[in-house]
């Protein structure tokens, strides 16, 4: 590899001496590859079109056959063949054919101008009459046909993955369409996107362990946000009736095919709405964005057909658990009763689940969650695990909350928001007690947030959607790392360790 780099560096120096500086400032393409392919699909085989074009891109392949050479040039939209004829290039400038065939390698960025021709084999080509080195590559490309077989390398060096994998490029193109589609959908309905702090003095809005940092000038410990909820609710208190933020969230937790410590979510708050209104908003928005990104609301994910056409199934957590286990948690009045019934049904009973409501949630996670393949709104959660949600209007011990599950994964979470400041303080104090007892994911008491509620917050529906998981679904990607351009990775090796394997 070092020898190859040295050889390419010598070529770069030679180009410099020839006045073809290997790193150009600008180039002005007249067309993109896909545009040329579409506009000149009618050009017959073996014919030329006297249209002057200029294209730029990365050289992906090169074949030199005596007095002819064929390069494949790729830009963001597609590829086109470069037809290089010694006689034509030498007529423009002596030595040009030799220079381009000996000094240009696969991986180099090249700008060319010429006319169009279609080869006898039907390949639309630019017959090159002028060329310019735009950027000399000193490293070889991965194998064009096999791509990056090392999955870890795909994530660590995403730029290589994008060069050789059209599928990866399409994934991130769809991600961009999805993000812009969500913003457009909300903007068109008079929602305002307002940025909230990433650095916060209190980590709240979710049960999660935060990243901790320090502000040197203020000598102040700070947290990277684990949610945008509490600040967006402050904005509702301040009079913004429809507000959202789409951005990065940080949680100091484990990594898996579903979890990355840095991820993207959108949180949406609508005054005068509730969790039922948020269900309607969620299914309408996701269905429309899916239509824009995928061309329809029926998609294929990892061998399973998924129908995102509204309306979606709605079922309570109690109903789903009883359906899956035969256990009616509404009949249990003590934790001991629920625990005994769970053990008899073959369910695990974690000691940390210290109430009937927490055990209900455990039963749901163990027996129900993975089976929810088609989009399902799971509603009416235990109050113990929902400290920011409003008490249910007719079901004691529950809150007005739903989570959306698709292909067995939580994709969205929403509430009728808790706006009673006295109730909110009591619940956050209970959370603070759990935190003091060692629960690292429990929320603290944000006094300013409670004060904001005391100023007065209108009835509000709130929603959070995991963008990365939604992108996974719409791109048929099995891992969250496939849809995050640069996911956090374990170090390949540390100075005091042998290199890791796998």
Swiss-Prot record:
Q: Where does Mg(2+) 2 bind?
A: 410
UniProt KW Transmembrane helix keyword: no
Quote the record's cofactor note: Binds 3 Mg(2+) ions per subunit.
- One family from Pfam that matches here is tRNA_anti-codon
Q: What cofactors does this protein use? A: Mg(2+)
Q: What class of enzyme is it?
A: ligase
- Is Magnesium set as a keyword in this record? yes
Reactions the enzyme catalyzes? tRNA(Lys) + L-lysine + ATP = L-lysyl-tRNA(Lys) + AMP + diphosphate
* Record EC number: 6.1.1.6
Identify a single GO molecular function assigned to this protein.
tRNA binding
Q: Which keywords label this protein?
A: Aminoacyl-tRNA synthetase, ATP-binding, Cytoplasm, Ligase, Magnesium, Metal-binding, Nucleotide-binding, Protein biosynthesis
Which residues participate in Mg(2+) 1 binding? 403, 410
Localization (cell): Cytoplasm
What coarse category fits the chief subcellular location reported for this protein?
A: cytoplasm
Alphabetical GO CC annotations of the entry are:
cytosol
Q: Which GO terms describe its biological process?
A: lysyl-tRNA aminoacylation
Q: Which NCBIfam families match?
A: lysS_bact (TIGR00499), PRK00484.1 (NF001756)
Family, per entry: Belongs to the class-II aminoacyl-tRNA synthetase family.
> What does the record note on quaternary structure?
Homodimer.
Protein name, entry field: Lysine--tRNA ligase
This chain's source organism reads: Synechococcus sp. (strain CC9902)
């Amino acid at each position: 590899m070092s020898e190859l780099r040295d050889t390419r560096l010598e070529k770069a120096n030679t180009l410099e001496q020839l006045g073809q500086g290997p790193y150009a400032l600008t180039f002005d393409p007249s067309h993109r590859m896909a545009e040329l392919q579409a506009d000149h699909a009618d050009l017959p085989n073996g014919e030329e079109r006297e249209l002057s074009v200029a294209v730029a891109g990365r050289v992906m392949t090169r074949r030199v056959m005596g007095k002819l050479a064929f390069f494949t040039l790729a830009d963001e939209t597609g590829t086109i063949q470069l037809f290089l004829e010694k006689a034509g290039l030498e007529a423009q400038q002596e030595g040009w054919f030799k220079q381009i065939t000996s000094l240009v390698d696969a991986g180099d960025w090249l700008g060319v101008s010429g006319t169009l021709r279609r080869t006898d084999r039907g390949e639309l080509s630019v017959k090159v009459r002028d060329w310019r080195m735009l950027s000399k590559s000193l490293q070889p490309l991965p194998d064009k046909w096999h791509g990056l077989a090392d999955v870890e390398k795909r994530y660590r060096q995403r730029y290589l993955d994008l060069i050789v994998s059209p599928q990866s490029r399409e994934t991130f193109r769809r991600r961009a369409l999805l993000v812009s589609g969500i913003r457009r959908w909300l903007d068109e309905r008079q929602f305002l996107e307002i940025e909230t702090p990433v650095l916060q003095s209190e980590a709240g809005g979710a049960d999660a362990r935060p990243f901790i940092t320090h502000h040197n000038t203020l000598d102040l410990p700070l947290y990277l946000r684990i949610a945008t909820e509490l600040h967006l609710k402050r904005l509702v208190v301040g009079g913004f009736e429809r507000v959202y933020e789409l951005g990065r969230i940080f949680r100091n937790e484990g990594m898996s095919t579903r979890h990355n410590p840095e991820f993207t979510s959108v949180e949406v708050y609508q005054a005068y709405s509730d969790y039922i209104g948020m269900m309607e908003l969620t299914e309408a928005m996701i269905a429309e964005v899916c239509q824009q990104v995928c061309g329809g609301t029926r998609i294929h994910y990892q061998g399973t057909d998924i129908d995102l056409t509204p309306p979606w199934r709605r079922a309570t957590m109690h109903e789903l658990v009883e359906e899956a286990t035969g256990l009616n948690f509404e009949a249990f009045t003590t934790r001991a009763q629920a625990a005994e019934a769970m053990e008899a049904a073959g369910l695990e009973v974690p000691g940390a689940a210290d109430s009937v409501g927490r055990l209900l949630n455990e039963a749901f996670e163990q027996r129900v969650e993975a089976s929810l393949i088609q989009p399902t709104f799971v509603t009416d959660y235990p109050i113990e695990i929902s400290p920011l949600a409003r008490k249910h209007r007719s079901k004691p011990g529950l809150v007005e909350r739903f989570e959306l599950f698709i292909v067995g994964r939580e994709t969205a979470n929403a509430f009728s928001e808790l706006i009673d400041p006295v109730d909110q303080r009591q619940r956050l104090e209970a959370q603070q007690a759990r935190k003091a007892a060692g629960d690292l994911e429990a929320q603290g008491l944000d006094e300013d947030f409670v004060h904001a509620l005391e100023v007065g917050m209108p009835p509000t529906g709130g929603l959070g959607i995991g963008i990365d998981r939604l992108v996974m679904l719409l791109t048929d990607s099995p891992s969250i790392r496939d849809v995050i351009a640069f996911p956090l990775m374990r170090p390949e090796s540390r100075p005091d360790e042998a290199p890791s394997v796998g």
